């Protein structure tokens, strides 16, 4: 098992290093918040997001046209560490982006998208007060359906502003299916480094029908994610 972990981690690491040579601009995402950036036709990216408790979410995305991209991801928990790795789901999650308006000098770019990949562990149910509560959700919900508007300016290097709304699709068993709001920006420092900042308001995660912390999980706190 340790050899398997070593092989997977090294594959992800070296692939990420290789892909950074031709990273598209503007970025497809900030840290987790989507932008209106899409992949050029015929190009692809492979990236991984490291999550808490040794989890990794590798994602492959392909640009089918300049305005349409499709990706798949697969959450693996406890890949880093001594615990036995396990997957969130037996099937991969999907990411779809379609840019309906290209950015111009005066107007921002607008993208409609779908992202079913949440953050953290996916749980079908939890135990609360000796009762089984069905939740069917990630620790941090997936974006689901979303719309994002992006505008870039050349201000001593690129400055990008990104604002969007989203609605979860399949993670509403907690009784909270509100629309959500997010925003972020990226500031190019030089050709190799950029400053990224994002905020997810988590309006769709500020209520839970059992109304407690549930095994120290963060469900229902509604404080947002910075």
In which residue ranges do the predicted regions lie?
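Residues on the lipid-exposed face of transmembrane beta-strands in outer-membrane beta-barrel proteins
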Residues: 46, 58-62, 72, 94-98, ...
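Outer-membrane beta-barrel strand-turn architecture
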Residues: 40, 52, 64-68, 76, ...
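Transmembrane beta-strands of outer-membrane beta-barrel proteins
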Residues: 28-29, 47-49, 61, 69-75, ...
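Outer-membrane beta-barrel biogenesis signature
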Residues: 18-47
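Outer membrane beta-barrel transmembrane domains
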Residues: 184-188, 192-226
């Amino acid at each position: 098992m340790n050899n398997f972990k070593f092989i997977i981690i090294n594959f992800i690491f070296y692939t990420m290093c290789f892909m950074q040579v031709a990273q598209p601009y503007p970025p497809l995402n900030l840290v987790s918040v989507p932008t209106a950036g899409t992949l050029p036709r015929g190009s692809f990216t492979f990236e991984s997001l490291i999550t808490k408790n040794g989890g990794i979410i590798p994602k492959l995305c392909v640009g089918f046209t300049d305005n349409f991209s499709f990706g798949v991801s697969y959450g693996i928990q406890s890949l880093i560490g001594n615990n036995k790795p396990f997957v969130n789901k037996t099937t991969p999650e999907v990411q779809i982006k379609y840019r309906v308006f290209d950015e111009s000098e005066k107007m921002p770019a607008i993208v409609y998208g779908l992202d079913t990949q949440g953050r953290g562990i996916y749980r079908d149910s939890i135990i609360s007060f000796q009762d089984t509560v069905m939740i069917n959700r990630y620790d941090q919900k997936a974006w689901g359906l979303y719309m994002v508007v992006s505008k870039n300016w050349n201000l001593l290097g690129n400055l990008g502003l990104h604002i969007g709304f989203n609605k979860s699709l399949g993670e509403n068993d907690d009784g909270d299916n509100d629309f959500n709001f997010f925003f972020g920006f990226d500031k190019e420092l030089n050709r190799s480094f950029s400053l990224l900042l994002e905020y997810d308001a988590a309006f769709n995660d500020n209520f839970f029908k059992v109304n407690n912390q549930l095994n120290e999980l963060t469900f229902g706190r509604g404080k947002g994610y910075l």
